[in-house]
Amino acid sequence: MDKFTTLEGVAAPLKIINVDTDMIIPKQYLKTIKRTGLGKGLFSEQRYNDDGSENPDFILNKPAYRNAKILVAGDNFGCGSSREHAPWALLDFGIRCVISTSFGDIFYNNCFKNGVLPIRVSQADLDKLFDDAERGSNATVTIDLPAQEIRGPDGGTVKFEIDPFRKHCLINGLDDIGLTLEKKASIDSYEDKAKTERAWA
């Protein structure tokens, strides 16, 4: 998993509440267990028309937001069924941070496990970030994870809270496998001791 320290880029404003995981990545994309290639399915029912052409009105199809790294979204983002493909699709598209007032619990946890930072802010702060994001490619937003701070294009800042353990994992690029490997020396020591003390086992 790639480390996350600071992220600077365009933020796309998605002013829709209750975006569920089926909207993020429709069910037809769930057949694969590969984490790559899912970016094309991100919001596919909104991004594409029935004939496969792009919907020019959808935010991520607008020229200013095609390379967005940050998504500013409405309340209760990622609600609905459990599907780890949702953060996979965001990440494969290039989005590493989602900002909202609240998230679906399972989606929220899955984001951390896959290197995507979900940030909870107040409604007042979200409204300000929407205003910043609507400036398009002229507005760059910076996410500073060590400082737990969002910096807008006008220099304004928004502080956010994050669990210290999850912060440690993101900064050091540690997924579940990485966390296990971080304890490898202790695991090896325990196994060597167990072999000596319980040779009969």
Curated annotation (Swiss-Prot):
Molecular function in Gene Ontology: 3-isopropylmalate dehydratase activity
Pathway where this protein functions: Amino-acid biosynthesis; L-leucine biosynthesis; L-leucine from 3-methyl-2-oxobutanoate: step 2/4
Give the EC number(s) listed in the UniProt record.
Answer: 4.2.1.33
- Which SUPFAM superfamilies does the UniProt record give? LeuD/IlvD-like
> Pfam families given for it?
Aconitase_C
Q: What GO biological process terms are annotated to this protein in UniProt? A: L-leucine biosynthetic process
Q: Which cellular component terms (GO) are annotated to the entry?
A: 3-isopropylmalate dehydratase complex
* Chemical reaction(s) catalysed: (2R,3S)-3-isopropylmalate = (2S)-2-isopropylmalate
Supply the InterPro entries for this chain: 3-IsopropMal_deHydase_ssu, Aconitase/3IPM_dehydase_swvl, AconitaseA/IPMdHydase_ssu_swvl, IPMI_Swivel, LeuD
Q: Which UniProt keywords apply?
A: Amino-acid biosynthesis, Branched-chain amino acid biosynthesis, Leucine biosynthesis, Lyase
Q: Which family does it belong to?
A: Belongs to the LeuD family. LeuD type 1 subfamily.
The entry's function note states: Catalyzes the isomerization between 2-isopropylmalate and 3-isopropylmalate, via the formation of 2-isopropylmaleate.
HAMAP family recorded? LeuD_type1
Provide the assembly information: Heterodimer of LeuC and LeuD.
**Know the name of this protein?**
3-isopropylmalate dehydratase small subunit
According to its UniProt entry, this protein's organism is Rhodopseudomonas palustris (strain BisB5)
Tell me the gene name. leuD
